[in-house]
Amino acid sequence: MTKFVFVTGGVVSSIGKGIVAASLGRLFKSRDYSVSILKLDPYINVDPGTMSPFQHGEVFVTDDGAETDLDLGHYERFTDTPMSRLNSVTTGSIYQAVINKERRGDYMGGTVQVIPHITNEIKERIHRVAKNTNPDIVIIEIGGTVGDIESLPFLEAIRQFRKEVGRNNVVYMHVTLIPWIPAAGEMKTKPTQHSVKELRSIGIQPDVLVCRCDRPLQPGLKEKLSAFCDVPVASVIMSQDASTIYQVPLNLEEEGLAQQTLELLNLEPRQPDLSQWRTLVQQMQSPSKQIEVALVGKYVQLSDAYLSVVEALGHAAIATNSVVKIRWVSAEDLENDSAEQHLEGVSGIVVPGGFGVRGVDGKVRAIEYARHHNIPFLGLCMGMQCSVIEWARNIAHLEKANSAEFDRESPNPVINLLPEQQDVVDLGGTMRLGLYPCRLTPDTQTFALYKQEVVYERHRHRYEFNNAYRSLFLETGYVISGTSPDGRLVEIIELPGHPFFIATQFHPEFRSRPSTPHPLFLGFVKASVDYNHVSLDSKIQTHIELVTEENTPSIALG
């Protein structure tokens, strides 16, 4: 029978429940247990697809086209297991399903209430993950903070869940904060005590406490928490801040989190194999070189808006024994300032996805700068569309070339709406979403990186390259290195004679993993490292020449 671990959070939001859930999944997998992780989000949106990146951060897209919380990206990267739409549940989707059932008459005229109808639907979603993927263990992260009114139906549902499936098949894990108070010179447990008290008032007694802290727990603190929260000392787990999130599974393993949880579930503890993971972390912590890459985006004020891009760059950095320092550049700043002012000195430029006209001209200027100065460039989704616009304006000399998304009156809409999107009215869940095949063109840089003819990548867009301009682009030197299998949709472009200039309509960042960096990100980081060396050698040579000139004595001829 499938076992279930529920992860709740207390005291503050953004406590790190997602990383704890993902880390626990990694620890279970290292013991050869199959795992699936489910996120229950208490917001009323049906999914995060229409939410502002400034509020929610990145929208992570699964193979089956679900627009989900960024935590699902952590789940996939840590467990190396693909998630699906079943792994993301929101209050909005729960209420939508219940109301649809009521409209169909499924409740036979009964009064529809939070208990039992909403809670039953929540429990059904949890069971659905277990039935469809049949894992040994399902980890369920409950979004929000204990005490929030929005979380109450989910907490009531998981309270009922243990009674229905059996005490030995469920573990309640509570992630909480142990703050350090400088004035007192000590750590305080009172916030955690109150958080556990709040959980108990709902009918949930946590089995495991995961204590987030910025320094080691002081002597006696675990015993104190054990006494006041009625949790065994061995189940009070320290989770100290780490230099990288990939260190967290190793820290939690040292604290015995997986072993304690497996014992509570009556499962064999087994010996973990974390050798590969330890090697990855060691490589991250001992790089031999550093490069600086500019990320030119619309939402750079919140780095979580580009979380998977940042992680994919990090994965490639591990493989190249380097560290990637990101220079966050607002695309809007490039509309008013010179590109050189913001981009000088970088070894690579990434232009990621986005929606809407704001900042587009800044992205175009960044791409022009990369092309002119032979700086490695990687464009993603809108980044590819902007590279098409840049080429159309500056090389193909198409007057007022633009995307139909940004200028419906453009005489040269080199990016146009997909035909199947013409009659779409709703915004949520209606784009070209999920995994699609892409056929690569032989003898291209892209083909050399992937080393295969057909690849599968995740998409999230409504607009595509306008094929009315394909011949003109090819005539002016553009290379189309990837298309849909029928050749209709342009999916990848590149420029010959450039160290690295590749742009994709899809989002390769969603399929990158710490142990298997995505080929395009790996190629980009390698090219950026090479560019950095060439640039540094050039600067050294210039310095030598200047010094030589300054030290050359002047000779008077007469």
UniProtKB/Swiss-Prot annotation:
The keyword Metal-binding applies. The active site is at C381 (nucleophile), H507, E509. It comes from the Bacteria. UTP binds at S13, K188, T189, K190, P191, T192, Q193, K224. Its EC number is 6.3.4.2. Pathway: Pyrimidine metabolism; CTP biosynthesis via de novo pathway; CTP from UDP: step 2/2. Signal peptide: none annotated. It catalyses: UTP + L-glutamine + ATP + H2O = CTP + L-glutamate + ADP + phosphate + 2 H(+); L-glutamine + H2O = L-glutamate + NH4(+); UTP + NH4(+) + ATP = CTP + ADP + phosphate + 2 H(+). L-glutamine binds at G354, M382, G383, M384, Q385, E405, R462. Residues 1-267 are annotated as: Amidoligase domain. GO terms for cellular component: cytosol. CTP binds at S13, D148, I149, E150, K188, T189, K190, P191, T192, Q193, K224. GO terms for biological process: 'de novo' CTP biosynthetic process; pyrimidine nucleobase biosynthetic process. Residues 292-534 form the Glutamine amidotransferase type-1 domain. The keyword Magnesium applies. Allosterically activated by GTP, when glutamine is the substrate; GTP has no effect on the reaction when ammonia is the substrate. The allosteric effector GTP functions by stabilizing the protein conformation that binds the tetrahedral intermediate(s) formed during glutamine hydrolysis. Inhibited by the product CTP, via allosteric rather than competitive inhibition. Belongs to the CTP synthase family. CTPSs have evolved a hybrid strategy for distinguishing between UTP and CTP. The overlapping regions of the product feedback inhibitory and substrate sites recognize a common feature in both compounds, the triphosphate moiety. To differentiate isosteric substrate and product pyrimidine rings, an additional pocket far from the expected kinase/ligase catalytic site, specifically recognizes the cytosine and ribose portions of the product inhibitor. This is CTP synthase.
